Amino acid sequence: AQIRVVLRGDFMSPDGPIYDSQLYYVDILSEQWRGGTQASCSQIWNSFPDVGGPAPWLTTPDDPSGLYSAVSLYYLAGMLIANGEVDTSSCQDGGLVFGDELTASECGLDVAFSDVVEWQNRFDSDIILVANDTGVPAQLLKNVFSRESQFWPGIYSTYEEAGLGQMTEKGAETILLWNPSFFSQFCPLVLHQSRCDLGYGNITIDEQTMLHGALVTEVDASCPDCPAGIDLEAAHFSVRVFAEGMIANCEQVGRILNNITGKTAGELTSYEDLWRFTLVNYNAGPGCLSKAAKRAFLLGGPLDWLNIAARLEPACKTAIDYVEDISMDLSGVEPTATSWVFVARPLRTPTPRTFPTETPTPTPTITPTYYPGQPTYTATPTPQSYPVETG
């Protein structure tokens, strides 16, 4: 266990009069802690949040109303219009951008705005529940969903990403490899228990690939026969899967930093910056983060966000905007690009779901052209690509 005790009050002049009551701020990091959910990934990183609480984007409100947003989301409006949920016959352009059947025009957004607001808040209760179960900050999850998919939990026709957090098969691989608890729960839904007992790294490549596809299918809420073309039950369930994915990325970030420096992540930088590194890992991949961190370390600079961001290679620098947007209290309206998604391969035809809509979890339990607000894609990390430092 690790304990932090911070004196609170006027203690600057020990020999002089004390005007404040003697107060102590106490934090505990321990796997045996039973006093409530700890700040997510603190145990993995051995890192305490800032005294007084984390930044707003890393908080979890007491109830769903604390996540309420009313952002003009052009892509979400376009999907609602295209799926017949909003009547835009009053718009001369039909409510969509000319030549783009996925993005709402200004008129379309105006007509659809109340539906857009209702839709972007319909997952708030699930986000709060999952955040309380897993410790992944609720505001972080909501901002990621806004940035990735604008809360449209389906799959796109030209890019192999699915769900609220735009998961790829590489992103599925990250969860299954770096979150063993989730692997042990999900694997038996697809493979025989005897195979799952071997662990992710010891099953065959074909079995791993089968699991990747099954997990992407699980978070894909596309449903041609459902209202608005979305299976909302599957969408609600997928919130937990993406939270588990964030935990997997936390684990990978901790390992990357340890391989480079020989120290725990919490010894190197702040809790808030470690979450920024996790978002880089999620969006641009472990190779981008690892190279930047190694360069900063070899140059003797601090491993903080400003220094890591400055050391990102040109192809990785889109992650800076991604991180800066999500680390605002409300995410921006232009979801992000994933650099590793395979384009031009046909997507799977939606098939009847064969997995349970709930994964038993002990305590819980990832874009086309760049019109305003239309999702681009998300780089989800591949564990096999990050370097392992040897002594």
Which positions does each model-derived feature cover?
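Cell-wall glycan-active module
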Residues: 1-210, 216, 220-226, 240, ...
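A short, structured beta-strand-centered segment in the mid-to-C-terminal lobe
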Residues: 227-237
